[in-house]
């Protein structure tokens, strides 16, 4: 549904000038400030101007520092997160992602209101400080704003064709220093998004005015699948911290009530925070919170939830599961029931009173848009009606198709389940990873399911690399030159990087220190082990050598070790590098693929479970050779970060020495989640001090004689 008061392109027959568009949007942006946002327990309403909570991103100062490799240090200091306004200050084009209720639209409207009123950009006082990155707060002086919400490809096409050229090219009035364009719900234009965004960026970047800004807002599941140029920075919206929630509640409520209002886990979502505030409820679980709120607003007959269900059925064009509403029947929606997040919870509540057949048909009709609803329904039934839950679960899983795979992921989050259902869900999750058909976000969920239930994949399996004459290097970076040939011996290499679970076993057995926050997380045991130094990786290899010799996995004349740089490069490139190859080489070929690795282009900004990108496997069968994490090699680099002392061509000059000065850096290969395609490839050479560690570097093992 369109945002009711938001103008769209071509609302008028004649084309508007830039001045007319800006004036119309200034009036609209000013009106945003008076839109109702929060309802207090006593019924008072706070508008956007007074009720807004400034939002943060998940991007930290550590992340920014780690764009270049550096030596990591353990610290007890909490992370410092960049606000959304910090990101807008630093990036001309931005894609912000957040789930329903995360505050995307509210942020955009408050920003436009602040620009229209020329007031200071909003920062959260509950956060200790603005990140100290040598830059001032974002100055809104002289800017103008335009907010657009899109329903489909036609909306975005009209925007690109009729409005943005005028805004970016002709906004030259002396009082206009730059235009901030917000495009909300870009996932609704997913089919032709790639071509549209290229046109928008051409218009934006061709303007000499560098104060222009483009803000794209999207659901995270959709944004992970959008092909976005590197000139668009991608970030995620951080849920509200307990400090942010307390800071909003404290001035408005008696001191004794503060502890009990919006303190629960679910209220980190801004929409649920608003619900808990009005209901004067902790909000530990969304479904319990919704029921308490419905009591607060006197919905004794369930009409609010029923109406939400009818609306949703019409939205997904599934009239077969509902009775048509009598003509002229309108429900006076409470303010918070207009939120998409709250509507989905309401629909789930109504479905809990209907048959399982209706629920299955409802989900199968549109499994993407109804996923959040089914999730809430399953949680309700798990708590209240075990028999109905089991019947619904079996009905959802009876067809061995993608929809059943999606249902399995939702069932896994519903709470405690029986062993039989756990096995069925694990089977579906494994198929999701093997097939790689579902979007990346759902493959992540599948990996979390397997981590929690016990990943059945052999994550220590090795690929055999035959002896051959291999080509190393590339012409894409001076440190990878010259390209040259080198003979290598037969060896075996891990198909996957060493995982959290594998390294945790080593830590437990040896007592070695490991500061990774992932080590005890049941949902991340199949993630690559990170925050490990080169010395840690070497120690793991020695420990695994002893174990594998003892159980016969390897012979007494074989050892487990880190790969040398040539071995790593051959495992990644699979013999397809040639002396005349121009450009980058990736494990899958010479053309970049956005769906083949967890690199900067993916926008995740953190490692993911191993093996989630089957399309990116090398021809030797090795997964995650590029992106996700940097991988330690045995090879020495030198003392300087920019230029190696041990350059190419590779020589037997002591660079493979196991003992060396701690100031001599060791080679890292493959790039990580924050590396772009020019680094996340088969030939780019990185490095780090052997005592350094970070959440973006790990390792895989080699077995050789």
Where is each model-derived feature located?
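Extended hydrophobic
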Residues: 111, 150-154, 220, 226-228, ...
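Post-nucleotide-binding-loop coupling segment downstream of the phosphate-binding loop, primarily
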Residues: 106-178
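Conserved Walker B catalytic segment
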Residues: 188-210
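Hydrophobic repeat-domain scaffold segments
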Residues: 270-274, 340-459
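Surface-exposed recognition segments
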Residues: 479-484, 519-522, 576-577, 582-584, ...
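Conserved P-loop NTPase "ATPase switch" module shared by AAA+ and STAND
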Residues: 175-194
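Active-site microenvironments of metalloenzymes and redox enzymes
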Residues: 487-597, 634-643, 703-705
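Charged, amphipathic alpha-helical interface modules that flank catalytic cores or transmembrane segments
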Residues: 1-91, 97-99, 106-113, 120-138, ...
């Amino acid at each position: 549904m369109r945002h009711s008061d938001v103008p769209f392109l071509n609302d008028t027959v004649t084309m508007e000038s830039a001045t007319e568009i800006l004036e119309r949007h200034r009036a609209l942006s000013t009106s945003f400030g008076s839109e109702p946002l929060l309802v207090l327990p006593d019924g008072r309403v706070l508008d956007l101007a007074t009720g807004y909570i400034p939002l943060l991103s998940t991007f930290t100062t550590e992340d920014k520092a780690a764009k270049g490799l550096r030596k990591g240090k353990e610290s007890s200091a909490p992370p410092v997160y960049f606000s959304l306004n910090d990101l807008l200050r630093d990036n001309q084009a931005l894609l912000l992602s957040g789930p329903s209720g995360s505050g995307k639209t509210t942020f955009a409207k408050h920003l436009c209101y602040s620009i229209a009123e020329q007031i200071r950009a909003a920062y959260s006082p509950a956060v200790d400080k603005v990140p100290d990155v040598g830059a001032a707060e974002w100055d809104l002086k002289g800017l103008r704003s335009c907010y657009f919400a899109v329903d489909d490809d036609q909306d975005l096409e009209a925007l690109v064709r009729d409005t943005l050229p005028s805004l970016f090219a002709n906004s030259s009035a002396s009082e206009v220093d730059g235009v901030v364009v917000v495009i909300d719900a870009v996932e609704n234009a997913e089919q032709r998004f790639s071509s549209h965004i290229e046109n928008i960026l051409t218009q934006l970047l061709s303007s000499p005015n560098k104060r222009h800004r483009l803000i794209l807002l999207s659901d995270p599941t959709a944004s992970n699948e959008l092909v976005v140029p590197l000139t668009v920075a991608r970030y995620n919206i951080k849920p509200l911290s307990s400090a942010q929630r307390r800071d909003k509640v404290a001035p408005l409520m008696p001191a004794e009530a503060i502890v009990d209002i919006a303190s629960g886990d679910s209220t980190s979502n801004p929409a649920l925070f608003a619900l808990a505030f009005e209901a004067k409820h902790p909000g530990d679980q969304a479904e319990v919170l919704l029921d308490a709120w419905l009591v607060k607003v006197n919905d004794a007959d369930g009409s609010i939830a029923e109406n939400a269900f009818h609306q949703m059925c019409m939205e997904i064009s599934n009239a077969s599961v509902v009775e048509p509403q009598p003509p002229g029947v309108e429900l006076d929606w409470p303010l918070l029931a207009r939120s998409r997040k709250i509507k989905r919870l309401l629909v789930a509540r109504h479905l809990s009173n209907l048959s399982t057949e209706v629920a299955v048909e409802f989900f199968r009709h549109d499994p993407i848009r109804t996923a959040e609803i089914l999730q809430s329904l399953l949680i309700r039934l798990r708590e209240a009606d075990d028999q109905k839950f089991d019947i619904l679960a079996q009905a959802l899983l009876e067809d061995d198709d993608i929809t059943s795979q999606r249902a399995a992921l939702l069932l896994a989050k519903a709470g405690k389940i029986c062993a039989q259902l756990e096995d069925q869900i694990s089977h579906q999750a494994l198929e999701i990873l093997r097939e790689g058909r579902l979007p990346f976000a759902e493959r992540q969920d599948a990996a979390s399911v397997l981590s929690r239930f016990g990943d059945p994949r052999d994550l220590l399996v090795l690929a055999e690399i035959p002896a051959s004459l291999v080509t190393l290097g590339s012409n894409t970076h001076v440190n990878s030159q010259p390209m040259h040939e080198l003979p290598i011996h037969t060896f075996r290499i891990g198909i996957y990087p060493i995982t959290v679970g594998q390294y945790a076993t080593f830590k437990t057995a040896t007592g070695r220190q490991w500061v990774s926050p992932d080590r005890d997380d049941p949902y991340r045991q199949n993630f690559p082990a990170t925050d490990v130094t080169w010395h840690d990786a070497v120690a793991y290899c020695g420990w695994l050598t002893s174990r594998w010799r003892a159980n016969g996995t390897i012979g007494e004349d074989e050892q487990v070790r880190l790969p040398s740089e040539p071995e790593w490069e051959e495992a990644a490139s699979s013999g397809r590098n040639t002396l005349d190859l121009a450009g980058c080489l990736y494990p899958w070929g010479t053309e970049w693929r956005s769906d083949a690795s967890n690199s900067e282009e993916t926008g995740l900004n953190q490692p993911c479970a191993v093996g989630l990108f089957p399309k990116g496997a090398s021809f030797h069968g090795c997964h995650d050779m590029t992106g996700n994490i940097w991988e330690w090699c045995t090879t020495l680099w030198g003392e300087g970060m920019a230029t190696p002392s041990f350059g190419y061509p590779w020589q037997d000059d002591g660079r493979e020495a196991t003992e060396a000065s701690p100031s001599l850096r060791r080679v890292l290969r493959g790039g990580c989640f924050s590396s772009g395609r020019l680094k996340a490839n088969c030939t780019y050479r990185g490095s780090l001090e052997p005592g350094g560690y970070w959440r973006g570097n790990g390792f895989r093992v080699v077995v050789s004689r």
